[in-house]
């Protein structure tokens, strides 16, 4: 089964993300469980938690279909001790919020070395941050998102993801989310069915499909290997649509959230239908 949805707004309460997903015909969704541009947020209220769980049950969303995203402020590889501690504390809070909502995944951008420490040191800090978080909060899997490689962001090479996972002690509590725009911008060609075969074979060899816990399905405004992260709609931009056909007809992408973060929310329902039309039963 393909779980397809979008990163919907949780404005007015996280329970509203469920209803907004139903409106666009989704059977998956992503959300922020707090304001993504603030360090701290009020705790989730009991009635909010109850409504979220009830709405998920009524509309048949299981935890496997929901991919929460953490705050953009968090940098789990921060070279500065004070800011690293602040990021780790915020990440644990994000994990705790997911656990309170009955969710089992938390998607995050791995981190940046800020040109102050080596890549290896930064990757080790990210892995240590994951170890601390999963020791602090039960049930929730830390899902590392591949990046486009802008600036000093790590996670744009499969080897970065593999190196983090290797240093995480509990392999059951770590996974990966692949973003198609980020893959392309990082230099992984996914513009044809043949190049998709090669790129995802490389992913399986270096990281392993057993760690794939979600996908972000996005077009790109920039060229292959641009190292610039600019999302586009599915059918516009530089990647083309073969990658989406590949994903929709490959069992490796079954039963994980396939999440749109494309730039026109008003056509998300149409894009979900487009993806479903690519399935060759």
UniProtKB/Swiss-Prot annotation:
Keywords: DNA damage, DNA repair, Endonuclease, Hydrolase, Metal-binding, Nuclease, Zinc. Zn(2+) 2 binds at residues 145, 179, 216, 261. PROSITE patterns: AP_NUCLEASE_F2_1, AP_NUCLEASE_F2_2, AP_NUCLEASE_F2_3, AP_NUCLEASE_F2_4. Pfam families: AP_endonuc_2 (PF01261). Zn(2+) 1 binds at residues 69, 109, 145. The keyword Nucleotide-binding does not apply. Zn(2+) 3 binds at residues 182, 229, 231. GO terms for molecular function: deoxyribonuclease IV (phage-T4-induced) activity; DNA binding; DNA-(apurinic or apyrimidinic site) endonuclease activity; phosphoric diester hydrolase activity; zinc ion binding. It is an enzyme of class 3 (hydrolase). One of its GO terms (biological process) is base-excision repair. It catalyses: Endonucleolytic cleavage to 5'-phosphooligonucleotide end-products. InterPro entries: AP_endonuc_2, AP_endonuc_F2_Zn_BS, Xyl_isomerase-like_sf, Xyl_isomerase-like_TIM-brl. The keyword ATP-binding does not apply. Its cofactor is Zn(2+). Binds 3 Zn(2+) ions. Its EC number is 3.1.21.2. CDD domains: AP2Ec. Belongs to the AP endonuclease 2 family. Endonuclease IV plays a role in DNA repair. It cleaves phosphodiester bonds at apurinic or apyrimidinic (AP) sites, generating a 3'-hydroxyl group and a 5'-terminal sugar phosphate. This is Probable endonuclease 4. It comes from Glaesserella parasuis serovar 5 (strain SH0165).
